[in-house]
Regions:
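Divalent metal-coordination and catalytic microenvironments
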Residues: 18, 26, 48, 83, ...
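Short, well-ordered alpha-helical microsegments
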Residues: 33-37, 156-160, 222-223
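Catalytic pocket-lining loop regions of alpha/beta-barrel enzymes
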Residues: 95-212
């Protein structure tokens, strides 16, 4: 996928591109393994969120032995800045008992729980589990846990905006709103209605202290996506959206 958007999937390439585009740091949304050794990233470039995805579930029992202990081993690490959940793909409600210890651990360590919200890449996933209202429920029940709504719940923008505005412990990122290479001038012309809705709800809630830049790389070209978000977000809010909010919410210490 990286090659299709003009990139190479290796650290040297990303280091070069980060320098060219003045990207200070990245957060890797990890998946496929809870093994500590599988999450070895250059600390000058990346922090990571440890992911709990469907590949970790054993048969149909939805049981991961010692899950809280294994997640806590990551949260103890300085370079682990949170947890990533994929409820639509796992087909497990965010309110499921298996997740409750994870929310408490995240609160204890002061690290956020990022959640895939909105449209899924595979048709067999269940949207009801990744609708923004599912996040509202657990955010309200776990007020001491910081949550991040990934992809701004796209395309459920109205509900996403309501959940971010209502819950002080819910932030959102703007990753994954595009896919592939994009001619931005043509896109903003042809998708004017969609862009209008995005701008409308982002502007309506005025939660610019809780909205973060993100990419969902490698599905987008980094330079093009930065240009997309710059056209979407008013320039007066670029500093918090592109840097300050993520640095604070993920505790990056930059």
């Amino acid at each position: 996928m990286a090659r299709q958007v003009g990139h190479h999937n290796n650290v040297d390439h990303l280091r070069e591109v980060y320098g060219e585009l003045h990207i200070a740091h990245g957060v890797v949304m990890g998946n496929h393994s809870l093994e500590l050794r599988r999450h070895d990233y250059p600390t000058d470039l990346f922090h990571y969120c440890v992911g709990l995805d469907s590949s970790l579930l054993e048969d149909e029992s939805r049981v991961i032995p010692d899950l809280p202990d294994r997640v806590e081993a990551h949260l103890r690490r300085d370079n682990c800045c949170g947890v990533k959940l994929y409820p639509g793909y796992n087909k497990i409600a965010l309110s499921d008992p298996m997740y409750q210890p994870i929310y408490r651990l995240a609160a204890r360590y002061g690290k956020p729980v990022a959640v895939h919200m909105g449209l899924t890449a595979f048709s067999r996933a269940h949207l009801k589990y990744c609708h923004p209202l599912a996040l509202d429920e657990v955010a309200a029940d776990h007020p001491d846990t910081q949550f991040v709504m990934c992809h701004f719940g796209n395309p459920f923008l109205e509900a996403a905006a309501a959940v971010v505005e209502k819950n002080p412990n819910v932030a959102a990122d703007l990753s994954g709103l595009l896919e592939g290479r994009v001619d931005l001038d043509a896109y903003f012309r042809e998708q004017a209605g969609y862009v209008f809705l995005l701008r409308t709800w982002l502007t309506a809630i005025q939660c610019w202290d809780k909205v973060m830049f993100g990419t969902d790389w490698p599905i987008v070209n980094l330079g093009e996506y930065i240009g997309f978000i710059r056209q979407l977000v008013p320039e007066t809010h670029w500093e918090p959206v592109f840097f300050d909010n993520a640095n604070r919410i993920y505790g990056l210490g930059l």
